[in-house]
């Protein structure tokens, strides 16, 4: 792999281990996101790669070279933080040129590179402005241009969009993806925002408690989460206690049987399904059907969410607003076997 972390251990004191033997491989030109809740170790991982934190164990290699002990300023990576960290007393042009000037490059070369990247980032008109005269989105683009102009081997983005409003985040997301693909720069992106992460990444590492729970494409993680933690984190809300009867057939504690289109070889697992994927059963369906009683109803705008009490447990179900069910009404639910996913517990 172009970039790899092998067995990275980081602890801040003897008791608190932040990263536990973390492994991650990134191919050249990929955009890989580290996704997870606060405190899962995603920013620490990025800081190890940047060189701000020395791991207690493990190695970090880039393009075949061991970078574990290389100091920050010699790594020559592009960095963009949540706070942008622009120099307030320098114009956009000078902010972007800063990294090239510290590398003692020829003045004409610097000018050419800066003007090119300003053009790519849509900042040509703003070259003479100062940070305080600009909006958050413009500042973010300057921070990005400054990171990209040095033509880094690796671009590191630490929650770069979390200070922007929702509409701007969307357009910046598209912008980052476009720039990253156009320049072909290998990128590590830290975020806790699932939608942002899925829309921008080639691969996603979902982190929990200092380890990577699942590393896969956004589509695979969304459709087939590997563990209960990953499933809960990306929006699965229904979990059934299941025991294996035979391949593709599982039973709940109440004896009801469920067919699945997958099997898992592990001791502890659960069945999970999204509230959107449960349907009303018609008379034809025989398997994966549960009878239930409507409980609490919540209005979600496009749909209602019902809590339905069944013999296998309470299930959350999203249904259209054209028909409203009343509390206590009896209904039959159908759980399609290709939507019922088995996850490790």
Describe every region a protein language model picked out.
Residues 50:
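Helix-to-loop junction immediately C-terminal to a conserved catalytic motif
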């Amino acid at each position: 792999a172009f970039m790899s972390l092998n067995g990275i251990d980081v602890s801040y004191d003897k008791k608190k281990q932040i990263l536990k033997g973390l492994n991650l491989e990134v191919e050249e030109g990929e955009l890989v996101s580290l996704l997870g809740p606060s405190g899962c170790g995603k920013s620490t991982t990025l800081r190890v790669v940047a060189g701000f934190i020395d791991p207690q164990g493990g190695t970090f290699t880039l393009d075949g070279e061991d970078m574990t002990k290389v100091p920050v300023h010699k790594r020559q990576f592009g960095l963009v933080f949540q706070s942008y960290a622009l120099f307030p007393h320098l114009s956009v042009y000078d902010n972007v040129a800063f990294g090239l000037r510290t590398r003692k490059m020829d003045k004409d070369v610097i000018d050419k590179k800066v003007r090119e990247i300003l053009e790519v980032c849509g900042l040509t008109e703003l070259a003479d402005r100062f940070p305080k005269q600009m909006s958050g989105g413009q500042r973010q683009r300057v921070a990005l241009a400054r990171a990209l102009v040095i033509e880094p081997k690796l671009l590191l983005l630490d929650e770069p969009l979390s200070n922007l409003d929702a509409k701007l985040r969307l357009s910046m997301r598209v912008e980052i993806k476009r720039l990253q693909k156009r320049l072909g720069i290998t990128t590590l992106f830290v975020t806790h925002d699932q939608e942002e992460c899925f829309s921008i990444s080639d691969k996603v590492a979902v982190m929990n408690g200092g380890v990577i729970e699942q590393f896969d494409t956004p589509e695979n993680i969304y459709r087939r989460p590997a563990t209960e933690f990953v499933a809960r984190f990306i929006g699965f809300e229904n979990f059934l206690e299941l025991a294996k009867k035979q391949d593709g057939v599982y039973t709940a504690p109440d004896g009801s049987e469920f067919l699945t289109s997958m099997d898992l070889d592990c001791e502890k697992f659960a069945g999970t399904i999204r509230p959107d994927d449960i349907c009303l059963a018609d008379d034809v369906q025989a398997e994966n059907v549960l009878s239930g009683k409507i409980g609490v109803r919540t209005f979600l705008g496009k749909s209602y969410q019902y809590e339905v009490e069944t013999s296998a447990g309470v299930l959350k179900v999203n249904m259209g607003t054209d028909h409203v069910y009343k509390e206590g009404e009896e209904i039959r639910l159908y759980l399609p076997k290709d939507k019922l996913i088995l996850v490790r517990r």
